[in-house]
Design a protein with these regions (language model features):
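Conserved residues at the C-terminal ends of beta-strands
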Residues: 159, 191, 249, 269, ...
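ALDH superfamily catalytic-core signature
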Residues: 232-237, 259-261, 265, 273-422, ...
Length: 547
């Protein structure tokens, strides 16, 4: 039975989670180092499937390796098959009505508590899992699995509260108009990536917050950190069945979900190719569904920095190094191509070569390493092929890096390529690694670069303009209006903060539903309009019907 709501509640003020800097000698650094040491000593962990609150061990397992030490297993996770996926769907649908009926502020309280558990009790553990399992250094883990995860959970609560207050602005005499924001009919399939622990949590939590039930398939290379999130949700009071944790082979799990009559939505972050294939499968199955599914996806990018002749090279170079090489270039938003005017090229090249040479690459336990390893062997091989292509081409020159070694971990040195043409292979294709390609253009052709940027890739995720000249800033902002969903002025193209810069792009980069904003939550509700009349009518005819 639903609980009567006897007051209109209001959330506490929501602020971005403060980030620890893990400076030498700090207690935070000591705690994180201890968490890393403990986790390494206890690994490998066993990760079950979780359906209806029950931990299921199938005996069929896969290993999540540590990218910086590919002989070390962080966890062995049990994998689901189509039958278990069907069980997860059935259990989610069985939990749906009670979850949907739970008073809104009780749902909010669960996710607000989850955020506090991440912030305090489990901060170091989930950061350590992200470092060991996904190859992030301490700072990159902190801004992801601690700060951004907390921000997603808390700001979504605030956005949901704001969303529910949106009501019709007008009522006729004797009429009360109102709308309610119903959960979708059916279940949401969340398919999450390896590169952000926080995104995994958000893909499951955002639709669940709005009263939906979720089948969550985590990426194999992020299973352990995502499993910790699932356990945090449970500790925070999330009822069994609301989020079903179903690791395993994508074709079997996703295939079973997309073929189900009650499939209501796909919440996806991953590659453009996979997203397109899933959308195509939804189209093929459209006749099976109870309702038209909501498809929400954030996918690939070929993100750019456009440098104007008025830019300050001492700003351009450090911003570009961070954008290209943080987390080994494995952010959806990472810098992958630069357009540099010829009048600045000599100075930028000198600075860039000198600074990139200072980047340390190595194990996550050494906090002085700016970069660690790429995620797995497949990624390593793909990136290495792009580097080898540039090495063998007469149309390109490698001025930094260009070496790689997977004998211990999947290590690739930060690599800078200079291409003779803006349509060179590494200027146009997504690499998803620590490789940035530069095209040096005649400074008089600045505005011509707008079309080049837009026409040479299918993506439109992030981009930046660097210029002191305000006319150039304005011109580029207008000329590149559709080239990036997140556009930066004199700042790097990475680092969107929840509650400050809603994130997402269009074209081949996704549906641009803007994670970290109220826009995303609208995708997981179905609006019902209610009109209530208080006055009776005197008859059925209208004045125009009378003589």
């Amino acid at each position: 039975m639903a609980t009567a709501q006897l007051a209109t509640f209001k959330l506490p003020a929501i602020e971005n989670e403060p980030m620890y800097d893990y400076a030498p000698g700090s207690k935070e650094r000591q705690h994180l180092q201890e968490a890393l040491k403990t986790m390494r000593s206890q690994a490998p962990f066993e990760v079950p499937i979780i359906i209806n609150g029950e931990e299921i061990r199938t005996g069929t397992t896969e290993a999540q390796l540590c990218p910086t030490d590919n002989k070390t297993t962080l966890c062995n996770f049990h994998t689901a098959d189509p039958a278990l996926t069907e069980k997860a769907i059935a259990g989610a649908l069985a939990a749906k009505q009670q979850w949907e009926d739970m008073p809104f502020y009780d749902r909010l309280a669960i996710f607000m508590k989850a955020a506090d558990l991440v912030s305090k009790k489990y901060r170091y553990e989930i950061n350590a899992a992200t470092m060991l399992g996904q190859g992030k250094n301490a700072w990159q883990a902190e801004i992801d699995s601690a700060a951004e995860l907390c921000d997603f959970l808390r700001f979504n609560c605030k956005y949901a509260e704001d969303l529910y207050t949106q009501q019709p602005p007008k009522n006729s005499s004797g009429v009360w108009n109102r709308v309610e924001y119903r959960p979708l009919e059916g279940f949401v399939l969340a398919v999450s990536p390896f590169n952000f622990t926080a995104i995994g949590g958000n893909l499951a939590a955002a639709p669940a917050l709005m009263g939906n039930v979720v089948v969550w398939k985590p990426a194999p290379a992020a299973v352990y950190s995502n499993y910790l999130i699932q356990k945090i949700f449970e500790e925070a009071g999330l009822p069994a069945g609301v989020v079903q944790f179903v690791p395993g082979p994508a074709p079997e799990i996703v295939g079973a979900c997309l073929a189900h009559r009650d499939f209501a939505s796909l919440h996806f972050t991953g590659s453009t190719h996979v997203f397109k294939s899933l959308w195509q499968k939804v189209g093929e199955n459209i006749h099976k569904y109870r309702s038209y599914p909501r498809i929400v996806g954030e996918t690939g990018g070929k993100n750019f920095h456009l440098i104007h002749s008025s830019a300050d090279p001492k700003t351009v170079v450090p911003q570009s190094i961070r954008a290209a090489f943080e987390f080994q270039g494995q952010k959806c938003s990472a810098l992958s191509r630069m357009y540099v005017p010829d009048n600045l090229w000599s100075e930028i090249k000198t600075l860039l070569v000198a600074e990139v040479a200072k980047i340390k690459v190595g194990d996550v336990a050494d906090f002085t390493n700016f970069m660690t390893a790429v995620i797995n062997k497949a990624a390593f091989d793909k990136i290495a092929k792009y580097i080898d292509f540039a090495k063998s081409s007469s149309d390109a020159e490698i001025i930094c890096g260009g070496t790689y070694d997977d004998s211990k971990g999947y290590f690739i040195q930060p690599t800078v390529i200079v291409a003779k043409s803006p349509d060179f292979k590494t200027m146009t294709e997504e690499i998803f690694g620590p490789v940035v390609t530069i095209y040096v253009y005649p400074s008089k052709d600045f505005e011509k670069m707008y079309q080049v940027i837009q026409d040479t890739t299918e993506y439109a995720l992030t981009g930046a303009i660097f210029a002191a000249d305000r006319h150039a800033v304005k011109s580029a902002t207008n000329g590149l209006r559709h080239a990036a969903g997140n556009f930066y002025v004199n700042d790097k193209c990475t680092g969107a903060v929840v509650g400050q810069q809603p994130f997402g792009g269009a074209r081949g980069s996704g549906t641009n539903d803007k994670a970290g904003s109220i826009n995303l939550l609208y995708r997981f509700v179905s609006v019902r309009t209610i009109k209530e009349s208080f006055l009776p009518i005197s008859g059925w005819s209208y004045p125009s019907n009378h003589e």
